[in-house]
From Swiss-Prot:
It is an enzyme of class 4 (lyase). Pfam families: AP_endonuc_2. The gene is iolE. Its EC number is 4.2.1.44. This is Inosose dehydratase. It comes from Histophilus somni (strain 2336) (Haemophilus somnus).
Length: 298
């Protein structure tokens, strides 16, 4: 890949999991961002331990050569909470804009089971046609609000949500305007379908609307256990569903090839939540960074 086209970031979820605060609670913000820099990354998404004071956060990140490239935002359009979602989004947008980010990654969390003790493959929600229209109207409005600051809004397809499968991604892309984008997540798509080919087909199909990329690997043996025992999303995370690129079953070279073929410009972010007491965050960050260097050439 062309080094001038892509920047490499890593998410703090490998150090502390905001969905499971007891996982990695001993790891501080300063340790987290110091180790990101030490591993060779120049970008980060935002975790719960990050200072919200813009000047303080900038100073601590600048010291380490780290930029903020995105931060998760939960939307609830299907639940009928448009007004609250829009208000929160504007505050979130302004924070990210002040930090220099260009994209805003969102997840539609209406009836999401990703944080609940429900079987991830059997109990996920399915949106009705009317609910899809609520979502489309909401995301089309978010796109306009993002554009006011020269930013782009992108949806993070995610296990346990109403937008998880390729068919659901298709529906989302079909009913939203062209200025509503996609956050492509290798791990969540592979986890959902168990297919490298399907994952690559989705990426190539929508590459012109992909503005942010999460590089997440998957351990097939853990997914098999999750399916066999009707485990929840977070139960799978604790057991090791996810890991850094090069440590699981996904072959990332075709992903990098597609991104290069279509001249993708933006961030690639390693997002690999696992128990830091088992998978040392610095060790795994270095492992993921080395794999990307070897396979993508950046």
């Amino acid at each position: 890949m062309k080094a001038e086209n892509v920047k490499l970031g890593i998410a703090p979820i490998g150090w502390t999991n905001d969905d499971l605060p007891e996982i990695g609670k001993e790891n501080t913000f300063e340790q987290c961002v110091s180790e990101m820099a030490l591993a060779g990354f120049t970008g980060s998404e935002v975790g719960s331990k990050y200072p919200r004071d813009i000047d303080v956060l900038k100073r601590k990140l600048d010291l380490r050569g780290i930029q903020i490239c995105n931060a998760w935002f939960s939307t609830f359009f299907v639940d009928g909470k448009k007004e609250e979602t829009i208000k929160g989004f504007i505050e979130h947008r302004d924070f990210l804009h002040a930090m220099g980010a260009k994209v805003i990654g969102c997840s539609e969390q209406s009836r999401s089971i990703q944080g609940q003790k429900k079987a991830i493959f059997k109990e996920k929600t399915i949106f009705t046609e009317a609910e899809w229209q609520l979502l489309a109207e909401g995301y089309n409005e978010l796109a306009k609000l993002a554009a006011e600051k020269g930013m782009k809004v992108c949806l993070h397809h995610h296990m346990g949500t109403g937008i998880q499968t390729p068919a659901e991604i298709d529906k989302y892309m079909e009913i939203t305007n062209d200025d509503v984008y996609l956050l492509f997540d290798s791990g969540h798509l592979y986890y959902s379908e168990g297919s490298q080919q399907v994952m690559l087909e989705v990426l190539e199909k929508y590459i012109h609307r992909v503005v942010h990329v999460h590089l997440k690997d998957v351990r097939d043996e853990v997914v098999a256990e999750v399916k066999a025992n009707d485990l929840s999303f977070l139960e799978g995370v604790v057991k090791g569903t996810f890991t850094v690129p090069g440590d699981g079953v996904i072959d990332f070279k075709p992903i990098f090839d597609i991104l290069e073929k279509y001249d993708y410009k933006g961030w690639m972010v390693v997002e690999a939540e696992q128990d830091p007491a088992i998978a040392n965050p610095l060790e795994y960050a270095i492992k993921g960074r080395q794999y990307i260097r070897e396979v993508a050439g950046v």
